Amino acid sequence: MKLLAVVAALSVVAAAPAAAQVDLAGQWGNIHHVESMQRGAGPDLGDYTGLPINDEARHAALTYTASSVSMTERGCMFYTENYILIAVHNIMIERVNDPVTGDILAWRVSAGGSDRAPITIWMDGRPHPSANAPRSFSGFATGRWEGDRLVARMTHMKRGVLRRNGVPLSDRASMTLHFVRHAEILTIMGIIEDPIYLDETLVLSMAYRANPRGNAPATNPTCFPFTELPGLDTPGTVPHFLPGTNPDEQTFAKHYNLPLDAAYGGVETLYPEFRRTLQGRYTPPAACTRYCCVAGGLNPAGLTCRQR
């Protein structure tokens, strides 16, 4: 009888780690309840608020123009994998099992038909490649379970952007993703580190809801590059702004009466103490005139919040 009790106790202990794991497989729909402007139309030019960027990143962002994405050779390029934290697409997560043992070899996160590559999170203990190994749009990710959270460490991403207004991300950046499921809600939190462009880590998150319709695309549609702007047909044409020539450098700051150092981000702007430095330098606008109610700044009646 004692032997049976010991065997039963050991079986419970052995099963505990597996029991803590959560099934993430399925279709997940994006929840558009935060930062509708950032994840919809896109951030304002010159808006680097909330980013712990350094001077090099700021200067690179101020020379950026969205016309560069319209170049024929860039029209079908993916965003890097940090885009999963700022995009509005749905995703599909698949479990890849060993056909013999049934162990989980990897988790695959689809791109949801968007402009980023799928993510494969390896769970079989394989090491990360050399620091000098080639980069890819999918990066290289390995995962482990911490309680009921899947934690994935990603390296070897290509150079990309932190925001769609040109804030850069270097190919030396790494990202830690936390997948947390609460019933029908899936939260993905990302911690981004970049020794080239960030002075501190950047933390972002995205929420998804289980999608019973199952209509999230498993793969991206075929992309056919073409010249979107006739002016880009000229060989050697690369859209850009030379330092100090970007006409939108101060548009965001002026619209919201922000001092430039507040609009241009940086580590010091992330902390509450920075508010004290704005005393006497910042006057809030009298009323909201943009993005006041829903994405685009219009309520369902077609009026801005100011007009109601």
What does each model-identified segment do?
Residues A20-R308:
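PEST-like low-complexity, intrinsically disordered acidic/proline/serine-rich tracts
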Residues A15-P17:
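N-terminal signal peptide c-region/cleavage motif recognized by signal peptidases
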Residues M1-V7:
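Sec-dependent signal peptide recognition
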